[in-house]
């Protein structure tokens, strides 16, 4: 089983996160940020992983530190669980419609960190959640997993729908990339290492 558990404690947050890439059971997610709980639940469902997150943060300031630190911890867990990345597809992509919105994700588990985030999130807040934190979250995930991650909203009107389409597309693309392919011997790179 490809699993990982990490604890990250700073002066601003305390994060406990575990992931199982090979078995999907009910995930338990409690971040103190309701909208993020919703998005992580969708991500876990569509990536077909088990994700458990317990976070306490300085949300009396805002959700920035909590969201970013969860992204960091998720990225570190993904990196550890994937280990040497033997026989995985490596690449994944997905288009996901959410009512009037269409989200797209393409990713490469290359060992090289990069984020392209192309999403016009016209509503700056959803409840008390700052929508600019979506990019911060994915930046933290991409750089700590060491993945090349491209996310784009092709069109849409409702900011919630746009973000939901991105999280679902990310989950589905990640599932494709982490799937073990018996036709791939070793790692999926001419370099022999990812």
From Swiss-Prot:
What the entry lists under Pfam families is as follows: IGPD
Coiled-coil-forming residues are none
Q: Which GO terms describe its molecular function?
A: imidazoleglycerol-phosphate dehydratase activity
Which domain of life does the protein's organism represent? Bacteria
What reactions does this protein catalyze? D-erythro-1-(imidazol-4-yl)glycerol 3-phosphate = 3-(imidazol-4-yl)-2-oxopropyl phosphate + H2O
According to UniProt, this protein's pathway is:
Amino-acid biosynthesis; L-histidine biosynthesis; L-histidine from 5-phospho-alpha-D-ribose 1-diphosphate: step 6/9
UniProt-annotated location(s) = Cytoplasm
Annotated GO CC locations:
cytoplasm
Primary enzyme class = lyase
Q: What is its EC number?
A: 4.2.1.19
Q: Which GO terms describe its biological process?
A: L-histidine biosynthetic process
Q: Please give the InterPro entries that the UniProt record associates with this protein.
A: IGPD_sf, ImidazoleglycerolP_deHydtase, ImidazoleglycerP_deHydtase_CS, Ribosomal_Su5_D2-typ_SF
Q: Which keywords belong to this entry?
A: Amino-acid biosynthesis, Cytoplasm, Histidine biosynthesis, Lyase
Q: State the HAMAP family in the record.
A: HisB
User: Of which family is this protein a member?
Assistant: Belongs to the imidazoleglycerol-phosphate dehydratase family.
Q: NCBIfam families from the xrefs?
A: PRK00951.1-2, PRK00951.2-1, PRK00951.2-4
Q: What is this protein called?
A: Imidazoleglycerol-phosphate dehydratase
Name of the encoding gene: hisB
């Amino acid at each position: 089983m490809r699993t990982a558990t990490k604890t990250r404690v700073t002066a601003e947050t305390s994060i406990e996160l575990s992931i199982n890439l090979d078995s999907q059971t009910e995930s338990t997610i409690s971040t103190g940020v309701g909208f993020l709980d919703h998005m992580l639940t969708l991500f876990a469902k569509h990536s077909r992983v088990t994700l458990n997150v317990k976070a306490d943060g300085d949300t009396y300031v805002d959700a920035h530190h909590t969201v970013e630190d969860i992204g960091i911890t998720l990225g570190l867990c993904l990196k550890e669980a994937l280990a040497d990345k033997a026989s995985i597809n490596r690449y994944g992509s997905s288009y996901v419609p959410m009512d009037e919105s269409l989200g797209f994700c393409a990713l490469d588990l290359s060992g090289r960190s990069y984020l392209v985030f192309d999403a016009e999130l016209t509503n700056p807040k959803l409840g008390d959640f700052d929508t600019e934190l979506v990019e911060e979250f994915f930046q933290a995930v991409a750089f700590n997993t060491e993945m090349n991650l491209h996310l784009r909203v092709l069109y849409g009107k409702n900011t919630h729908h746009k973000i939901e389409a991105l999280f679902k597309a990310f989950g589905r693309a990640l599932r494709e990339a982490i799937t073990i392919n018996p036709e791939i011997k070793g790692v999926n790179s001419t370099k022999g290492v990812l």
